[in-house]
């Protein structure tokens, strides 16, 4: 008997989000226009589910990125995120290397979880998704694992669960430590967002909100049919 057969249906990651593999992402940029402004930093964390159906952070990648040729650089954005694009200690790589590395990590995790496609999870996710997709288009990296427009927005989810939409406030509500001095570092914000998303998914499970009774009944019917065949 395989591991997936031994683990209950709803405790398998591939069955939690309709076949989607969730990947937490945060970006730091030189503006708000994904087509014109530079992508300067990107971090991503994949997730795994244990045999009891609880979600946990898993693999991570993090890149400082060189502005693409002709990119706009908004000084106000650099002042906000504290990035010095001329600092040689950044160890910045090209967009091509960053997106290639991201996609490779995500595809491996997606395959290991037996998921059909990956989906971006981010705080105010439209922003992060737009920059990832624009960079993928610029670089021409093939086999983009992400859904082209679907996403999970932790700002919306936290607003529903806690009445808080700001990341630090949502983390505080979930009793997740948050160091404001490290905020606006893509890696730190991704780590906090990953913990927040896992907390919300796991807390919903603890409250009895998942699996929903209707989906449980449907799964029982499916299992009965398979057993009868």
UniProtKB/Swiss-Prot annotation:
Pfam families the UniProt entry points to: RNase_T
Swiss-Prot/TrEMBL cofactor(s): Mg(2+)
Family the entry assigns: Belongs to the RNase T family.
Cofactor annotation comment: Binds two Mg(2+) per subunit. The active form of the enzyme binds two Mg(2+) ions in its active site. The first Mg(2+) forms only one salt bridge with the protein.
Subunit-structure text: Homodimer.
Organism encoding this protein: Haemophilus influenzae (strain 86-028NP)
Lineage, highest ranks first: Bacteria, Pseudomonadati, Pseudomonadota, Gammaproteobacteria, Pasteurellales
PANTHER family the UniProt entry points to: DNA POLYMERASE III SUBUNIT EPSILON (PTHR30231), RIBONUCLEASE T (PTHR30231:SF2)
Annotated site residue numbers, Important for substrate binding and specificity: 32, 80, 127, 149
Domain annotation Exonuclease: ranges: 23-197
Record's signal peptide: none
The EC number(s) this enzyme carries: 3.1.13.-
NCBIfam families: RNaseT
Record's protein name: Ribonuclease T
InterPro entries tied to this protein: Exonuclease_RNaseT/DNA_pol3, RNase_T, RNaseH-like_sf, RNaseH_sf
GO CC terms in record: cytosol
Alphabetical keyword list: Exonuclease, Hydrolase, Magnesium, Metal-binding, Nuclease, tRNA processing
UniProt-annotated binding residues for Mg(2+) 1: 26
GO biological process, one term: DNA replication proofreading
Record function comment: Trims short 3' overhangs of a variety of RNA species, leaving a one or two nucleotide 3' overhang. Responsible for the end-turnover of tRNA: specifically removes the terminal AMP residue from uncharged tRNA (tRNA-C-C-A). Also appears to be involved in tRNA biosynthesis.
Binding site for Mg(2+) 2: 26, 28, 184, 189
